[in-house]
Amino acid sequence: MSNWSINDARTGYNVNYWSQGLYGISDEGEATVSPDPTRPECSIGLNELAKDMVKSGVNLPVLVRFPQILHHRVNSLCQAFNQAIQKYQYQADYLLVYPIKVNQQQTVVEEILASQVEKEVPQLGLEAGSKPELMAVLAMAQKASSVIICNGYKDIEYIRLALIGEKLGHKVYIVLEKLSELKTVLEESKKLGVTPRLGLRVRLAFQGKGKWQASGGEKSKFGLSASQVLTVIESLKSEEMLDSLQLLHFHLGSQIANIRDIRQGVSEAGRFYCELQKLGANVKCFDVGGGLAVDYDGTRSQSSSSMNYGLTEYANNIVSVLTDICNEYEQPMPRIISESGCYLTAHHAVLITDVIGTEAYKPEDIQPPAEDAPQLLHNMWHSWNEISGRADQRALIEIYHDCQSDLTEVHSLFALGQLSLTDRAWAEQVNLRVCHELQGVMSSKYRFHRPIIDELTEKLADKFFVNFSLFQSLPDAWGIDQVFPIMPLSGLDKAPERRAVMLDITCDSDGTIDQYVDGQGIETTLPVPAWSAESPYLIGFFLVGAYQEILGDMHNLFGDTNSAVIRLDDDGRTNIESVLAGDTVADVLRYVNLDAVSFMRTYEELVNKHIQEDERANILEELQLGLKGYTYLEDFS
């Protein structure tokens, strides 16, 4: 493609849309990051960054974090709500609460909190959904607003720890998820001499659409029904503690793609709020929960990997709907809280790793079948020879279908012992040749060709074997078909010569990425420069900062990857601030209660028994290094 330009690459990978200006492709065809969006001219080439890290001893794969992106996301979200509050003359403020379940890494939480250091009035709190998370936020929330929201199921210990948080100077909202929690909170608060701050999670009738819609609606796992809400009100009145009810919470589900769903949910919850006020409650906070989506594919659509709205529109809709309802009921306007973890963290992290090998189809010379060969083979040979002579575009479809049908029958006859292995191999090669040549003559300008072109593209795509575990680093791609943008880190200034699928190094056929972002939406293959064994070929997996680390598992005992924190200094220079080593083999063995020390003793016994004396020291050293080594492949970095 002689007229290829760098803008074609930017369009082909849709990077201008899913990246929101944080990632890009340089004029030299290198993938870049702009860690500090206030200085877009200070971009970092990811390919060179990865090579520098490898030279310094950091093996691939490596998860690269850009903390300045976290700061930018916090400030952007707060600014959007602050502007909406001013625009609609809303009579209360906004608080952003980070649910640490999205990414509990210390570096991430501390950087999110650090974004508020220079704020005169911090607009950031933390959310916990379990006892371990609560213990973490009790030690960190004072670095921002000291607001803590406690969600999830709660036992006595959880509730007491939350109440102790009040004694430590925090503002801890205990959100009632079940009716039975109220009694425990009231009893333990009296024992500790603490006035609790209570919240109610209401179960809305409306249910947002998407993969996580089950977390909202009448059948959701959490929340109180309308009648249960009234029971709580009566119980608090009887205890003369109605003033303790200070927060209303609801959750439509994560990754809400349609802004109309958000408007409708806020509208229903807003009426809950006003009705509670009419009953004498003094609710001060309106917590819209999560739902703010991330546009993973950059299509700005209602797909489950996208969103049909922007940040300003999101804030404006919530503020305007709540303003109108409060004015209608003549009730005071509550502080607005949102729990937007994915929006804050997804963009800040990139997984960088290397392609360790490929498998690609290359046309081979094929001899015609022998005269006495089975008729099926002659049919396939005839189909191949028919391609070049067919001017009728619809006839090409017939050739394709005939050849696929014949190949299926070949496989059946081979399984019955009626065809030889040589016959089968010949038929498979002819079929690939037919597919290859049809791919060259079919055209997407014919609508009836398009489905077959898609099939051929997928069938003939190269296989890229990539040094990572899908289950450890991109578990959502496997578990829920989540789409993540993927790009080669260099060579993008030239037209892509191949299309490929990415396969990980686990011994599992599910370790394959099935969906790829491109300029047309979601495809089953990715356009890529040709691979060469002569030089490193690096791939970036983008927007992996939300949930992926904590959800990742150790399939085949591939452990945590190396990680690094990268920051731009005041002069625009790139600083590798810290590197956290990934799991060693000994680490992952210990996680599954296998003892590397006892293994080493066993190795020594076996070496002494089976290895000649002059080799023993070297063999033992290799075994020891194996236990200390990285769980991923190291020879290719």
Curated annotation (Swiss-Prot):
As one GO molecular function, the record gives:
arginine decarboxylase activity
InterPro entries in the cross-refs: Ala_racemase/Decarboxylase_C, Arg_decarb_HB, Arg_decarbox_C, Arg_decrbxlase, De-COase2_N, Orn/DAP/Arg_de-COase, PLP-binding_barrel
Gene3D superfamilies linked to this entry? 1.10.287.3440, 1.20.58.930, Alanine racemase, Lyase, Ornithine Decarboxylase, Chain A, domain 1
Q: Name one GO biological process term.
A: arginine catabolic process
List of residues binding substrate: F286, D287, V288, G289, G290, G291, L292, A293, V294, D295, Y296
The broad enzyme category this protein falls into is: lyase
What are the entry keywords?
Decarboxylase, Lyase, Magnesium, Metal-binding, Polyamine biosynthesis, Pyridoxal phosphate, Spermidine biosynthesis
Tell me which family the UniProt entry assigns to this protein. Belongs to the Orn/Lys/Arg decarboxylase class-II family. SpeA subfamily.
What's its job? Catalyzes the biosynthesis of agmatine from arginine.
- In its UniProt entry, what is this protein called? Biosynthetic arginine decarboxylase
Q: What is the lineage of its organism?
A: Bacteria, Pseudomonadati, Pseudomonadota, Gammaproteobacteria, Alteromonadales
Q: Which gene encodes it?
A: speA
